[in-house]
């Protein structure tokens, strides 16, 4: 406290210190580590068959065909004349060597049907 003598003015200074103590909170943080997902990629094994005979192991076809062999038959014997494809009905490209895919149309087992004379010919409709 400070006082001034002659003029009768006095000044009072009060300092207040507030100490707040808080109890530590019981917070916890849990971090879970997860493995990275492996990248999806094709890995060819050393015994993968190159069914397109192009010297590489990639294929635009739907599958890699391994021809079934009889018990005891050597895997090194190959008969190119008996190549028949993968047998999957969903494979529209085929797996036959030297053949290109054809445009969609009637299947070779069904002959094309002649047009029905009772039906109007296909073309633009006229009203």
From Swiss-Prot:
Residues 1-55, 70-127 are annotated as: Disordered. One of its GO terms (cellular component) is cytoplasm. Pathway: Protein modification; protein ubiquitination. Its EC number is 2.3.2.27. Signal peptide: none annotated. Residues 40-55 have a biased composition (Basic and acidic residues). InterPro entries: PPI_Ypi1. Interacts with TLR2 and UBE2D2. This is E3 ubiquitin-protein ligase PPP1R11. The lineage of its organism: Eukaryota, Metazoa, Chordata, Craniata, Vertebrata. The gene is Ppp1r11.
């Amino acid at each position: 406290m400070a006082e001034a003598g002659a003029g009768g003015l006095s000044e009072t200074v009060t300092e207040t210190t507030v100490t707040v103590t808080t109890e530590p909170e019981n917070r916890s943080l849990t971090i879970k580590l997860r493995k990275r997902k492996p990248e999806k990629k094709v890995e060819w094994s050393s015994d993968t068959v190159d069914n397109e005979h192009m010297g590489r192991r990639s294929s635009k076809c739907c599958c890699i065909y391994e021809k079934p062999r009889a018990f005891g038959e050597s895997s090194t014997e190959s008969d190119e004349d008996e190549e028949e494809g993968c047998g999957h009905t969903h494979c529209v490209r085929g797996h036959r060597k030297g053949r290109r895919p054809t445009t969609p149309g009637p299947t070779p087992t069904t002959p094309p049907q002649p047009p029905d004379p009772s039906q109007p010919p296909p073309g633009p409709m006229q009203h």
